[in-house]
Amino acid sequence: MENLESPNYEPALVYEWIIQLVSGTSREQALVELSRKREQYEDLALILWHSYGVMTALLQEIISVYPLLNPPTLTGPTSNRVCNALALLQCIASHPETRIHFLNAHITLFLYPFLNTLSKSKPFEYLRLTSLGVIGALVKNDSPEVINFLLSTEIIPLCLRIMENGSELSKTVAIFIVQKFLCDDVGLQYICQTYERFYAVASVLNNMVMQLVDSFAFRLLKHVIRCYLRLSDNPRAREALRHCLPEPLRDATFAQVLKDDHNTKKCLAQLLINLSDVAVVNQ
């Protein structure tokens, strides 16, 4: 492990925190320390995954809050604690040597109850956002294995609901995940395979566009346009979009907010060309 040679690396301390995490004596503090230091040690994921009892301890932390989800009684401190556990899972999901093991163990399924919550309180919002971060870490590297596995789960409907009802930050991570599915050929084919799947995605994107008319959330708009552009690569979806693409993307509604983003303007122009809206592009 190359980081053992780093002058800032404290292997004895890291292993002591792991012992505390597994033994349960000072688990909460161990979660805080490990999650705080996780970006300093690029091999921490390997230590976490291969250390006896660590994954069991992290899953215990996650499962322990299930009874607090419905009715929604999750408190801030409890949310912070489980989010520290989720941050360590994200560390494991991000590492190239542990990602596939993480996936094969179906750890992501333990996070879906968190994504399925509806409460808009800060503890729940933080829980959803951190859970999305774990999924985002998995899809970030465009791995076909990750896409294929997640397509067999309910992650897309969960992300769509968050895209419609979540905070701006949660919406941004959720649409990033959906965009990753769309950018994969298998993912695009899956979403466009039935009208119901396409309509579920398109209707949420349409609703987001109408919300963006008022909020002008730039990061979200970039993702929305890229999702539409990728959908237009599918012949059936392209034909449907000719009839249902929201008007604010056809006219100059977002011209001001996009004026300095040449890449996103090019994406929007290409989308309109794909849908044969040449007249609008040339205005």
Curated annotation (Swiss-Prot):
For this record, an example GO cellular component is: cytoplasm
Does the entry feature the keyword ATP-binding, yes or no?
Answer: no
Please give a single GO biological process term from the UniProt record: nuclear-transcribed mRNA poly(A) tail shortening
Q: Which Gene3D superfamilies match?
A: Leucine-rich Repeat Variant
- One GO molecular function term? RNA binding
What are the disulphide bonds in this sequence? Answer: none
InterPro entries, per the entry: ARM-like, ARM-type_fold, CNOT9
Q: Which UniProt keywords apply?
A: Differentiation
Record-linked PANTHER family? CCR4-NOT TRANSCRIPTION COMPLEX SUBUNIT 9
* Family statement: Belongs to the CNOT9 family.
Summary of the function given for this chain in its UniProt record:
A differentiation-controlling factor that is essential for the onset of sexual development. Induces ste11 when sexual development is invoked through nitrogen starvation.
- The name under which this protein is listed is Cell differentiation protein rcd1
Q: Which gene encodes it?
A: rcd1
